[in-house]
Structure formats: structure tokens, C-alpha cells
């Protein structure tokens, strides 16, 4: 069964700049035309060389703002700030959420760090980010989302990511603890929508990526996520006038070649996911014939944010 609406699919390779092996895998996917867009983690160990690769191959690139892993970019925040722990690192994926819930994060410092990351992005790439999302979805957290929206508007960055995946709760392969974390992300993201709209920020109609990370990525899972998302979207907009028959989707991906324990990361060394075969698995799925054939059969147009 083919899909009725015209589909524009942005396939984003996250964590570009995390390590050379990751970067090589993402660039290989771009050359294979299965990744259309990358998100640069600016405090990553290979951020400068990754930016050079993007310039060399004309890869559409945005900023993967990072407030949860490694060192801050802003010099004045590296010694004494609410964003770092006693080792000088960001508080981590769960740590930043705990600090936020306790009211211990200084939002003026969040603003300084986001602005410093945009400034460094401009220095490395020679351009403004074409879009801006975040590492571990911190940009939709309460308090941070308001600052994030203001910073994007001030820097004229028009696109971001809203990590709400329709049909996520149907995915029985996701462990309960991880599903609870995803539910929290989606709740925060839904509460972010009006804030981002107020600041003129846009995002694709649909998002896919939570149900298809790492070993959970398969051509079938991506196809089903697209089908379910598009059908749900069609039923939502069917009563609205003057809606054209097209839908935009972002597929968040993390392809690459596994890193070694000695390389990569954002100052603390690479995480387990970076060193696992899950990265290679995603790369192989994205380049697989079944997925390519699905896109071809359904007229899916792979594109970048600049094409939306």
C-alpha cells in the first residue's frame, strides 16, 4: 500500500563531531544519500574536523546543543557555574534533569552556554546553524526551553526538533524504564510547542527516532513508524481547510562506526552507545535495499531542513 501524501523526509545524523569513527560513518551515509542532514555536537572531540568535512562535502549542518555531556564551551562557565559538577563536567543526562527539578540551574548561564556554542559553530563552519536541536533532548526541559527559544529567535535559527513520536506507546520492544524516560521527553516536548511557536520557530510535521534507536532500528520499524505517523497526521488535518497533501518528517539517527575507549566524547571519553555495534547497525539499516525500496515505492523525497 503506497502512502497518499507527498512525504519530505529529513534524515538527521546526530552527534556529528563526537569522534572520527562516528563522523566517517555519517559522511558515508551522506554520500550514500541516506542521511541528508547532520547535527554538530560542538564540544565533541572531533567537532573541528567534522565541520571541515561538512564544508568539503557541502553537507547541510545544524547545531546539536549540548548541556549534559562533557565540558562547557563558554570559558567563564568552566570553573564555577551551576551547569557543571565538581569535576567540571556537565551533570549528565539524568543529572541535569535532577538539578533542574531542584531549581539549581542558573538560566542566565544556560543562555551564555547556548550563545557560546552558536558562536563556536559559526567560527568552525562559517555559517549560522541551519537548525538547532539538542543532545539528549534537553532543549524541551522546563526553563531551558524558554531560554532556548529566545536564543534561536535572536540568532535567526528557524528550525528545531519536537521529539514527539506518534505511535511510540505501541512499541512493545522498548523496555519499561526507557519508555518512562521517553514519556517524560514527550510530555516536555508537548508543553514546548506553544513556546516555540511564539518565537517563530518551526519543525517538521512529524518526528521519528525514539522507537528506532540502536538495535531497535530496522527497515520495518522505520516503515511502520512512517505509516502510522502519516495516517495519524492525515486524520488530524482532514477537517482543516486549505491543507496541501504533503507532510514533512524528521528521522533522528545515530549511524557510525564504533569508537574505541581511547577516543571520542566531549571530554569524558566516549559513552557505551558510541562504542557499541548499534552505531554500525544503524548505518547498515539506513543503507539497506528494503528501506531504499520503501522510499522509492512511496515517493518519499529525502531532503534537508533548508528544503522544507
Curated annotation (Swiss-Prot):
Family matches, as InterPro entries: Glyco_hydro/deAcase_b/a-brl (IPR011330), YdjC-like (IPR006879)
Binding, Mg(2+): 15, 135
EC top class, as a word: hydrolase
Pfam family, one: YdjC
Cofactor: Mg(2+)
Organism superkingdom: Eukaryota
CDD domains in UniProt: YdjC_like_2
Keyword terms: Carbohydrate metabolism, Hydrolase, Magnesium, Metal-binding
UniProt GO molecular function: deacetylase activity; hydrolase activity; magnesium ion binding
Catalytic residue list: 14
The enzyme's E.C. designation: 3.5.1.-
GO biological process: carbohydrate metabolic process
SUPFAM superfamilies, sorted: Glycoside hydrolase/deacetylase (SSF88713)
PANTHER family reported for this sequence: CARBOHYDRATE DEACETYLASE (PTHR31609:SF1), YDJC DEACETYLASE FAMILY MEMBER (PTHR31609)
Similarity-based family: Belongs to the YdjC deacetylase family.
Function: Probably catalyzes the deacetylation of acetylated carbohydrates an important step in the degradation of oligosaccharides.
Protein name: Carbohydrate deacetylase
Gene that encodes the chain: ydjc
